[in-house]
Amino acid sequence: MQAPPPEHCPGVESEQAGLVSACAGCPNQRICSDPNKKLEDPGKALVAAAMKDVKHKLLILSGKGGVGKSTVTTLLTRYLARSYPDSNFGVLDIDICGPSQPRLLGAVGENVHQSGSGWSPVGIDDNVCLMSIGFLLGSVDDAIIWRGPKKNGMIRQFLSEVDWGTLDLLLLDTPPGTSDEHLSVVSYLRDDSAPDSLKAIIVTTPQEVALLDVRKEINFCKKQRIPIVGVVENMSSFRCGNCGNSSEIFPAKTGGAAAMCQEMDVPLLGSLPLDPQVTRACDSGEDITAINNSTTEALATICSKIMASL
């Protein structure tokens, strides 16, 4: 029988299992550090029990920072919640060092409460809830300076100790790249008996400097056996509010997301414009999905494809 994992356990699937300072004194240290032993992370069973009523999990990924993953996560959540009022949606912010969902969803200053069932996520709308480390900080300016094992422990807590209730879809906002956060959340949520329960959306901008890293993220998903719902091209164009002309702020010199999707055999879900209304709404935490403009028209197409894929 395995002992409970220490608070900052790196996870038995990690290359650091049994080797980092958090493992000191753990009864399983010798077993975890044995390269010939393959163990199931005891935290995985706790996560599975806590997430049993969450039907679908959707990772929002990108290899590049600054492409708008968090903004896209917010827009998708808002539009889906408005379009499917009888469904329940959750957002989990696992960008541990840069949590932005409380700001984007208008929940700055909210507190997380604890009950016998665990942490209660913050309610955003009637059918939307949010959990983020941003709610656990003393100030929005507090820096989180953690190594991988501590991030892993925090993600495990979010997945196993938050009372999500019954959700039709949980969207997970991730940091850029393929780092500890990504490996942790995939190891806990991937279920080989239900491979379609965890899927991914990739966010990019049109220019090649972003596409270079996004290709790596797509390959990460393929290696980790995570089905890719498709790619969202963000900030594809900018329409001037004065003259009405459209401009390419990030020129697609190599064909943009469309060419990359064809090259890598993944679907293109759609393109979102660079919209000043969205920028202002993100800063204030307002919901703009009720208005009719080019952004919401694009969201309608993207969200219908997402729901059809689940």
Swiss-Prot record:
Cofactor: [4Fe-4S] cluster
Keywords: 4Fe-4S, ATP-binding, Cytoplasm, Iron, Iron-sulfur, Metal-binding, Nucleotide-binding
Binding site for [4Fe-4S] cluster 2: C240, C243
GO cellular component: cytosol
HAMAP family per record: Mrp_NBP35, NUBP1
Subunit details: Heterotetramer of 2 Nubp1 and 2 Nubp2 chains.
Official protein name in the record: Cytosolic Fe-S cluster assembly factor Nubp1 homolog
Species assigned in the record: Drosophila mojavensis
Lineage, highest ranks first: Eukaryota, Metazoa, Ecdysozoa, Arthropoda, Hexapoda
Name of the gene this protein is made from: Nubp1
